[in-house]
Amino acid sequence: MYQYSNQTGNGVYGNPPMQPLQNYGSSGYQQTAPMQQPLQTGYQQPMQQTMNQNQGMQLPQQQYQQQQPLQQQPMQQQPMQQQSFQQPQLQQPLQQQPTQTGMQQQPLQQQLTQSGMLQQPLQPQMQQSSQTIQPNQLNVQNTVQSQQSVQPLLPQQTGFYRQGNQPVLEPLKPTATGFVNSFANNGLDNNLKIPAIRLSFITAQDQAKFETLFRSIVTKGSNTVSGENCRAILMKSGLQPSQLARIWQLSDTNRAGELLFPEFALAMHLINNVLQGDSIPYELDSKTKNEVSSFIDAINLSVVSTESDFKTPFDDLFKPQQSLQPQGTGFLPQTSFGLPAQPTGGFGQPQPTTFGQLQAQVTGGFGQPQPTTFGLQPQTTGGFVQAQQVTGGIAQQPSMNPLTQQGTGFAQNQQGTGGFLQQQGTGSFNNAGFVQPQNTGSFVPQQQQQPVVQSQPIAPQSTGGFGPPMPTTFGIQPQSTGGFVQPQVTGGLQPALTGNIPQTSFGAQPFNQQLQPQATGYLPPSQFSATMPLTAQKTGFGNNEIYAQSNFNGPSFSTQESDIITSEEKSLFYKIFETFSQNRGVLDSATAVEIFRKSGLNRSDLEKIWNLCDINNTGQLNKQEFALGMHLVYGRLNGRSIPDRLPPSLIPSSTKILDNVKNQLISSSSDGNRKSFTRMDALSYKNDDNDKLPNFRNRRKNYPTDNDADKERQRRQEREREEAAKKKEQERKTKMDIERARKQGSFTNSEPEFTDVSVSEIEDIKRRITEAQQKLAVRNQSIPNDLKKRFNEVVARLPTLFVEIYKVDTEIMQARIELCKRRTPSSIIGTGPGGSITEDDRRKAKSKALLRSRMNALTGKGDNSDEPDIESESFTKEIEKIQSESAQNKKIIKDIRISISELSAPIRSIMTGSLPTCSSTDFEKWEIGVGLENDVREFVLTLKKGLLYVSEPSHMNSNQTLSHPPAAALKKEATGEDRAAQLKEQAQKRMKERLAKFGISRRETRDLESSKQQESGSTPDAVPAAQTANASQTPFEEVISSPQKMEVTSTAGEDNEEEDEEERKLKEQLELLKQKKNAEKEKRLADLRRQIEEAEKEEEHPSVAQSNSGNVQSSSNQPASVPVANSQPQNLQNTHITTKPLSLNQTGSSYDMASNTYFKPTQTSQSAFDREKAEQQRKIQRGLESDDDGWSDDDDDLYSKPNTAPQTAPVLDSSNTPQPGMNASVPAPIAPPIPTPQASSPAVPVAPPIPAVTPSESSIPMTSNADVAGADHLDQDTDISGAAASADKQNTSHVSHIPPVPVAPPLPQVSSIAPPPPLPNLSVPQPHETVDNDDGSDVLSIPDSVESDKEDLAPAGHTPAAMGIPPPPPLPNF
C-alpha cells in the first residue's frame, strides 16, 4: 500500500521514490520542534520559503496585507510542488521568519498561490499522506507535535481577504501620471458597474481614461457624477464658463443635473475637440445621440438588474462568491449561517497527490484549503500526506452518533498552528454520531484515518501542530476533516470530494473530475442548481435536518425573499414618469405602452404586465403603478417570471390605502345594516328593570351600539326632514316665482291686445301730428312756396348726407389701416377693433420673437429680438394716428352739423310762423334725426316728404282743391267717430299720399308694365297721364297728377316696390272693410241697373246725340259696348299699339282736352243730363246717404276715379247709340271731376256733366273694373278713320285706369260710326262685371281682377257686326 502510494506519486509528478514516513516522522518534526517550524522532510526550504512568504498574516493588524487576487494560476506553483513531496503549501506561515515575504521572493507566484479560487492542487497531499502512516509513526508525530506546542502560535487569518490595508498586496498598477491619474490616486470605485459598450466618437484609449477618471470622482453607491464634482474637472480644461455651460447642455441629455458615464465621456470629448480648435456644435448628431442613449439604457438595465450586495447575512449564500470575506481564526466563525468551522485556506484547487489525482478538500469556511501542520495549510497526500481537515463541515462516522459541537470562538486555544490560534472544530452534528473534537489550530498531531482500497480504516491523522494525540485505534471510523467531505482513499482509489457533502446525509457520490473552487460554508453546486441560493442554516445548534437533500433538490426549492421595488428603482422610474407625464399625475395608456414596448418583450408579456399594473382598470397609470410596471418589465428581462397575481409587497401603497378604506366602509355599512336589522326584537325597545343582572349587563353591553345607531338614524331622519322642509320651501318659492312669471307671461301674452291699442294710439298720434304739421305748413303764407320747398329739400337731405359722410370717413380710415398693414407685413397682426393690436397680440408676437431669437442663437444669426417690439410700437402708433385723424374728421363733421342746425332752426321757426324757441339740439333731433329711434326717424322723414310733395303743391292748386281735405278732416274730428274708423281712414290717406307722389296706383303700374310688353315703347306719355288721372283719389293728389308729373311716373315701378311693405299692411286693413262693402255692392248694382236703363232711354234721343260730339257718343256707348267689346279686346289692343300715337298727333284740341284731367267741369256745363239726378246718384255711390262705415269719406278717391269712367256713362245717357265709336278718342272726361275749366275743344262738350256722371259711372268702373282692365288698351286700338264702337267699349272699361286714352279721332268720323248693339244684351253681364269692378274699386287695385278681365277679353276676336267698323288686324297669340 505504501509502495503503491509512492509509485502513484512518482508516476504523477516524476519525483524519485522516497520514504516520506521517515523524513516526515523523525527528521521533519524533530528538527522543527525547537524552532517551531513545520516538519523538515527534505522539503524544508520550500516550506520555509512558503512560510516566510506568508509571515505577513501572523499579526491581527497584518491580516489584510496578503490578500491575494483571484487571478492565481495553479500551474505557476506546480514547480515548487514538484521539488518535493513533502512541501507543505503553507498559506499561513509562522512569525519566526519575518524577513522573507511572498512579495520579495516570489511576488507573482505568491499572489497566485494565496488566491482563494486557484489554490495549488498539491495542497491537500500532505494531509493525505500523513493519514497513511502507521500508528507508531503517528505516535512519533504526536510526540513531536507536543514538543512543538510549547511555543504557542499567534492567531492568524485562515480566509481570503478581499481588500487589504497595505497596497503592496494589491495587483501592481501603472504609476499615476497625468491629469486622469492624478484623480485616480484618490481611489477608484471598482464596484461601479459600467457596461462594456464601445463609444465610436472617442478612441478606446480615451474611453479607458475617461472611465478611470469617472470612477475616481463618482460618489460611493452612485453611478452618476454630480454637477459640482464634474465642474471641478471641467474647469481645469481652461475653457470659458459659457462654453462649458453649452457643453453641459449637450451632455446632460436627461436634464438631471448629473452625468452618467456616457454623458461624462461625451462632455470630455467635446472639451477635447474645443481644445484642439473645433467649435461646439449646436446640436449633437443623431449617431452620437443614439449611442449615448443606448449606453444610458444599458446602465439603467444594469442598475435595475443588479441587486445590492451584502445587505443581509444570507446574501453570501444566495450568490456564488468570487472573493471570500476575511475571517480570523480568533473570531467567531459563521456557524450560525452555514458551516461551523473557519476556513484554513482559500478556495481549494485540486492538487496532485503522490498516490493519485485527488480532489481539493476545503478545510475551512470560506477560505482556501490550507495545511493543518504548519499555518493550517492543506497537506499533500503523497509521502507523509496529511489529511486535509474541513473545519465547519459534517464528518461521516459509521457509529451514526451525532458529533459534538466544536468551538471555534475565542479562548479556545487547545490547538495552535504557529501561535495562539483559536481551536477549530472539525466535527459537527452528524448522523454518524459524536466525534471527538479535532484541533486544527495547534501543533497537536491529531490522527485521522481514511479508508484505503481494501476499505481498511486509517487512524486519524493530525492536521495541525503538536497537540494531544487522537485515538489511533481502528475502532473509530474515519472522520472527514472538512465540512461535507467524503472519505478519501489515499492510494489507487478514485479521488473523492473532500469538501462535498457526505453520502450519509445527501447521498453524494464521488466523481472523477476536479472540484470547482468553493468556500466552506457554501454548499457545492454538485448537488443542486448553482443559481439557487441557500437558505440560512444553523449548523452549530442542531436542526441540521434542514440539510436534507430534499430541501435543496426538491421542486419546492425557491427563493424566499420578497420581490420589492428598491428605492433606486423608484427614483429612476419616477424620473421617467415625470418626464412623460407633464405634471398631470397620470400617464395615458398610449405613452405607457410605448415605454413598455421599448423593452422588447412580446405582446403576451406586456399585456400581462399591463393587467397587473392597471389595478383599477382605468386605462392610465399613476406614478406608483408605472413604477410597478417598469419593475415587472425589468424583472422579466432579467429572467424572472411574471406573477399571475401581484404579491403584497408589490401592491402600491395608494392602492392598499384605497382598498383599506373601501373595506372599512363596506364593513361599517354591513355592520350598520346588520345592527339595524338583526336587533329588531322586542328587547331593543323594551327596558325591563326586573331582568337579571347578566341580561341587564348584556343589554348594557349590546344595546349602546344599537342605541347609538338609533340616535344616528334619528339624527339622519331629522336632517332629512329638515332638508325635505327646506326643499319644500324652495319648491314653494319656485312655484311662486313661476306663478309670478306666468302672470307676467300672461300680461306679456296679452301684450298683443295692448300692442294693438298702443298701435292704434300711435297711429292716432301720428295722424294728429300730420294734420298739425299740415296746418303749420300753411300758416305763414308770406314765404314763397318755392323757398319752402327748397329749404325742406335741403333739410330732408341732411340726414342722408351726414350718414354718407360718416360712412365714407370710416371707409377711408379702414383703407388706411389696411394700407398700413400691407406696408408692414412683418408687423404684429392686430385682432382688435379696427385692426388695433391688443395685449394678446403683443404676447403672441413676443413669444414668436423669443423663439426666433433662440433659433438665431442656435444657427449663429444675429439676434433681432427687439425688432418685433419696435415694429409693434410703430404699427400701433400709425393705427392710433389714423384713428385720431378719423375722430377729428368726425368732430369737424359734427361741428358742421351743429352749425347747420343753429342756422336752420330759426329759419324753420320763421317758416312755420312760430316763435323762435327751436334750439339747434331740437332741430338736429327732429329735423336731421339725431338721437331718434329708427321708427321715429322714419316717421319724421316721411312727414317731411309728405310736406314736400303734398302740402306745398296744394298751395299751388286752387282754393277749391285745398278746401276739401281739411274740411273732411275737421268733419271727422267733429263727428267723433271711433278710433278704428280714424285709423282706417288715416291709413287710406297715407296710402293715397304715397301713391300720389308718383301719380300712379299699384294696379296702374301693372297695367303699364303689361302694356309696355305689348307696345314696344309707344305712347309713353299718354299712359302715365291716364294712370295719373286714374290714381288720383284726393284733391291734393289730383294736383300732383298734372302733366308736369308725368316724368315721375316712369320710375313708379321702383318706388312702388319700396312701398310694398306698407301696402301689405294696408291691404290687411282693407280686407276687413271689404266685408262691409259687400252689402253696399248690392245696392250699387241696383243703381247701376237703373242707370243702364236710363242710358237706354237716353239713346232714344238722336238730337242730343247729334248736338253732342263724338265724345258724348263714346261715353254713352261704353256701358252698352262693354259686353260687345269683350269679343274683340285683343285685336283692339294690337291696333291700339299702332294707332295711339297717330290719334294723339291728329287732334291737338282734343288732345288738350283729353290730357287735361280737370276738363270735366266744362263737360258738365254742356251736358243735357239731369244734374240733380246725377248728383243724387253720386251721393249714393259715395255712400253719403247710406249707413257707411266711414270709408265713403275719402271723397277724393271716389271723386277722382269715378269721374274717369262716369264720363262714359253720362255720354251714354246724352248721346245717341249710333255714336259709340267716337268715345274711344274722347276718354278725356275720364279724369277726376276737378273744376279746371279747359273748354278749348269744341267737340268735347258733348260729354255729359262730370258731377252727374261721376256717381253713376264711378260705380261702373268699380264693379266692372276687372273687365275694364282687360279692355284698357282697346281705347287706343281704333284707327284714325274709324272703329269707334269697339274703341268706345274699351274706353268705358279702361277709363278708370288710363285717362290719356281720351285722345280720339276727329269728331266727323265719329258721326259716321254705326250705332252700338242694343243695350239689353249688356244688362245681364253688366252686374257681373260691376261686381268684379267693385272688388277692384278699392284703393288698392286687385291684380286678380285684371288678369280675369284679360282672360275674358281674350276670346273676343271680332268687332260687333252692328258697328260697321272694319275689323282690325288679328292680335298675336300671347
UniProtKB/Swiss-Prot annotation:
Chain ranges of the EH domain: 206-295, 569-657
Sections of the chain in a coiled coil: 706-783, 1050-1103
Protein's cellular compartments: Cell membrane; Endosome membrane; Cytoplasm, Cytoskeleton, Actin patch
GO BP: any one term: endosomal transport
SUPFAM superfamilies, per database record: EF-hand
Superkingdom of the organism of origin: Eukaryota
Family, as annotated: Belongs to the PAN1 family.
Amino acid composition bias (Basic and acidic residues), ranges on this chain: 708-737, 971-1012, 1063-1102, 1169-1185
Sequence ranges of Low complexity compositional bias: 1103-1118
Organism classification: Eukaryota, Fungi, Dikarya, Ascomycota, Saccharomycotina
Pfam families, sorted: DUF1720, EH
Positions that bind Ca(2+): 614, 616, 618, 620, 625
UniProtKB keywords: Actin-binding, Calcium, Cell membrane, Coiled coil, Cytoplasm, Cytoskeleton, Endocytosis, Endosome, Membrane, Metal-binding, Repeat
Subunit (UniProt): Component of the PAN1 actin cytoskeleton-regulatory complex.
Name of the protein in its database record: Actin cytoskeleton-regulatory complex protein PAN1
Ranges of compositional bias, category Acidic residues: 1186-1197
GO cellular component annotations of the record: actin cortical patch; actin cytoskeleton-regulatory complex; endosome membrane; nucleus; plasma membrane
Biased segments, Polar residues type: 1-10, 20-33, 1027-1053, 1124-1168, 1201-1222, 1257-1266
Spans annotated as Disordered: 1-33, 52-114, 668-737, 971-1374
Molecular function terms, GO-annotated: actin binding; Arp2/3 complex binding; calcium ion binding
Physiological role: Component of the PAN1 actin cytoskeleton-regulatory complex required for the internalization of endosomes during actin-coupled endocytosis. The complex links the site of endocytosis to the cell membrane-associated actin cytoskeleton. Mediates uptake of external molecules and vacuolar degradation of plasma membrane proteins. Plays a role in the proper organization of the cell membrane-associated actin cytoskeleton and promotes its destabilization.
Membrane topology: Peripheral membrane protein
Regions of compositional bias (Pro residues) in chain numbering: 1299-1320, 1365-1374
Domain EF-hand, first and last residues per copy: 239-274, 601-636
Main localization (coarse): membrane
